Amino acid sequence: ANRFFWQYQGRPVLLVGGSDTVNLFQWNETALRKQLDRLRAAGGNYVRNSMGSHYEGDVQPFAQCADGRYDLTRWNPEYWNRFERLLRMTQERDIIVQVELWELWATYGEHWKQSPWNPVNNINYTTENTRLAIAYPRPQYRNGTSYGKPTDFFLTLPELQDDRLVLTYQKRFAEKLLQHTLPYGHVLYCITNEIHPQYPPEWGWYWARFIRQQAAGRPVFITEMYWTPDFQAAQHWASLERPEVFDFFEASQNSALHDPEAHWRNLQYARRRLASRPRPINHTKTYGADSGPSWAGNDRHAVECFWRSLIGGAASIRFHRPPAGLGLSDLAVRHLRSARLLAEVFDFFRAVPGAEHRGLFGRAPNEAYLTSVPNEQYAIYFPDGGSVELDLVEVPGSFTLRWLNIGESRWTPAQEVSGNARLELQAPAKGQWVAVLSLRK
């Protein structure tokens, strides 16, 4: 088996998806069913689910007292019933769920003001007997990194601030979550959403150990989502260098890079770093939508990132929710369909991405990307038409060439081409295409 990819029910599986919210489990049953059925019909099999409850209308995990404060020792059944429903409905549809335990953004600004974990909002602790404050300002950003004091919620561990009281309730929450997830075999675990570089990596390592202890020998697959887009940055060493702690690498922030070649190189760097002990590289978010903020990029950025990730050897790729992503929009659905069409004919599980673009001649920046099962199959992605030469000089035999029109999810008629040559590949038109060459047996 290729350990850069997931196995599910004994078979290798490529995970692609899109969804319209961060915390799908919070939706009512009708809306949830509609979303999951739409995803499945598009060939999607992967969703993200943050356990956050910081948006308007979200239900909280804890019971409320008469005075409106929360009691962290009592559960709100509605929250956990909704979570259980998501687990059941995704399992029935063979959709893999990547669950995020902790939500960084719930500890800042307005979200923290409303949070049950805020000392003013519960009956279980105060600012006197814990390290937690009533308010935390959001981080500041400059020169591609983040500044500002960390929130104490992520510093409760014995080796950090040793805030045992808050940690007791955090462990109760994690135990309850795992009571729901551990009976299922289609769950991936991510510790935190976008933990920033000013937070010590011990937080993620601690909860990875905690999940493994609770799992008591059952297989679990765990990662941490670091905020820094550049995978060569020190923050990512905490994951890349620790295969015994994290079972896969979360590469979501790669799509925050807007230079297409940098986006490709970043993913190939992660693959190179993991090559001696391969692990799946997941993208639970792919940013970009015309509707979104400028930092996220536009529609075109999103779909190009999706295809570069696919050709580049990603194990999972999901369109982020609107407005900063395409979610499960009509455009996203078209691209999911096309990805599935390609995966039906091209063997991603045996393929090696052309990290340095060797084998492609006459290539301009962001013109074409190659992955191949050497001497057998070649897939070349063209983000916007163009032409390159594919080096088949040392490769004998004849090949079937087909073009996938990505925007329309359909194939052109097959043609026969010969090896032992530099083969010119000219995209049939502008727009996004994949050329697939398969050796004729």
Task: Specify the residue positions occupied by each region the protein language model found.
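Short beta->alpha connector loops
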Residues: 226-232, 254-256, 287-288, 383-387
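Glycine-enriched alpha-helix->loop->beta-strand junction motifs that scaffold or abut catalytic
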Residues: 241-249, 276-280, 312-316
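Flexible loop residues that form catalytic
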Residues: 52, 194, 254, 286, ...
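Active-site mouth of glycoside hydrolases
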Residues: 2-245, 257-258
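Aromatic- and carboxylate-lined catalytic core of secreted/periplasmic carbohydrate-active enzymes
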Residues: 279-281, 288-292, 298-415, 424-441
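Hydrophobic/aromatic ligand-binding patch that stacks against planar heteroaromatic rings
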Residues: 89, 273, 308
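Active-site clefts of carbohydrate-active enzymes
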Residues: 197, 248-257, 264-300
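Conserved beta-strand positions
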Residues: 49, 191-192, 251, 283, ...
